Amino acid sequence: MKESLFIQFISAIWPKLNLYVKEKEAPVKRSYLHKEMLLPVYSSDQKWEGTSAKTTYVAADMVAMDSPLPIKKRGTLATSNGKLPKVGMKKVLRETEINAINIMKAHYETATTDEAKKAEKQRILTKLLNDGDACSIGIDEKNEANFLTALSEGVLLVEDEDNAGTGLRVNFGYLDSNTFGTIVKGHVSYEDIENIRSKADADGNTITTLMVAKSKLNDIRKERWARELVADADDKVYTDETTLKVPSVSKFTQAFQDEFDIEIKVVDRSVIFEKNGQQKSKKPWNAERMVFLCSDTVGSLVWGTLAEATNPVEGVKYATVDQYKLISKYSTTDPLRETTNGQSLVLPVIEDVDQIYVLDCSEEKSTEVDKEKEKLDTADTFTTINGKKYKKADVIAQLKALGVKVAKNATDENVISAVNSLSDEQETSLLSNLTAQG
């Protein structure tokens, strides 16, 4: 590493990069939920385990980044010691771009008036500072993506720049007892919302916010109960045969809040990722999971001090942005490059997961009546759950043992709805006490 090729321009301004970033961000008004919903927590030993963050439920290990398996199912490569992962990005000026700035520099040096000189210098500074700004925002974007994934999934995979090909898998320990599927497969019902509210009430918690993907909210607005909810709010008279139009987002969210005393927070955030020179836009929030919260603050943004911050490399210019982002500028040769490097030790940590409730709307989450097998069961003796056949009387008995009211002569539809209304923990208990019938 050598000093920047344009040291005469950046030596005075680079330490003030933090001010430039904030000034440039203001008009854009980028929104970052991780900055609103996480409290910054400093870790003196560069570990997230020993901080004031509540990590009672958190478990972490190292896994392969490129495995096709879902994050939760990837095999463990090593045990994590709680070290904060290094997150960062680089912006590089190559020879063509360096030559372009050199031409600006020549114009600056040959300018005949102070005004012209000032204008040329500003052009050069803008070009050089933009990369620092991009690195700072890039780290924010990664933090936002990590946060949205963590909050919706309960599990996060963060690539560590110091360990190529592996990533830190953090499982925040979302409770199976607080995770539910939809009662009717593929549809979110009024009863699904009430089901989760009842569980929270039983736990002594009060749900205040529902975070949901825009696409999922659009699906919900089309449901009959959603249309009726808004029609009732508008004091409309209707019957079961009345066609009710799909309500607007604003009307439905207001009616929903009036009905359940829960505010809807719509998530529709995209983040651009770059790999092997290819950019791809991705929405990190899992649209199939609706997350119910009891607090606006859901955890900590744990950060540490980079070794390079206390052991600076000679010739490299450094700037600190938002306390934890270290932005450096330097040049290299063979080939000639001007590099801006942004790095940080940071991890969003979801806390108080006993106050987080999830409605998993994915197709594989809820079961449905197996109509083909039901036709063959002329005596109505069995109920099929997730492809396995059980004695219906046994299923009903176990549902009653879990406190679920089901009639002795309940139809398969009613039994399946009762099974779908269970939390993950209850469903596991139910199936463990049943014996599949050949």
Specify the residue positions occupied by each region the protein language model found.
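Basic helix-extension-helix modules of the SAP/HeH family
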Residues: 372-438
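Long, contiguous amphipathic alpha-helices that act as assembly "spine/axial" helices in icosahedral shell
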Residues: 85-174, 200-216, 336-345
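Sequence/fold signature of self-assembling virion shell proteins
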Residues: 227-397, 438
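Extended, solvent-exposed, turn-rich assembly/linker loops in the middle of proteins
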Residues: 164-241
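Short linear loop/turn motifs
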Residues: 25-29, 38, 48, 269-274, ...
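Assembly/oligomerization interface modules of large self-assembling protein complexes
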Residues: 34-111
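Long, low-complexity, charged/polar intrinsically disordered regions
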Residues: 144, 176, 389-392
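N-terminal alpha-helical "arm" segments
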Residues: 1-49, 355-367, 436-438
